[in-house]
């Protein structure tokens, strides 16, 4: 199963997988507007892969078959301040018990 992977010109760490190079006919128009001009990153054969770096291989294959595309979004950003505040609150609570 060959697919083409494109990087978004507008959204950092956002990638679009499509079945055929330069064929975006199955991608919704609104998504293409938000995605911006696609920049080809690579062509890969998913049949020879055991896993992908940032996406679930089986989910990618399923979406390509059912929808004709797969959108890979960036991982959620860590909120280190929120985590620190939660840890401080937990420490304070333990100290009061």
UniProtKB/Swiss-Prot annotation:
Origin species: Colwellia psychrerythraea (strain 34H / ATCC BAA-681) (Vibrio psychroerythus)
Name the record gives this protein: YcgL domain-containing protein CPS_3517
Alphabetical list of Pfam families matching this protein: YcgL
Residues in YcgL domain copies: 1-85
């Amino acid at each position: 199963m060959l697919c083409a992977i494109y990087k978004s010109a507008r959204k950092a760490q956002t990638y679009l997988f499509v079945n055929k190079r330069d064929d975006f006919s199955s991608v919704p128009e609104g998504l293409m507007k938000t995605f911006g001009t696609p920049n080809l990153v690579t062509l890969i054969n998913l049949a020879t892969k055991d896993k992908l770096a940032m996406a679930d291989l089986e989910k990618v294959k399923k979406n390509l078959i059912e929808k004709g595309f797969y959108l890979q979004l960036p991982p959620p950003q860590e909120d280190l301040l929120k985590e620190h505040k939660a840890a401080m609150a937990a420490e304070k609570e333990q100290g009061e018990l």
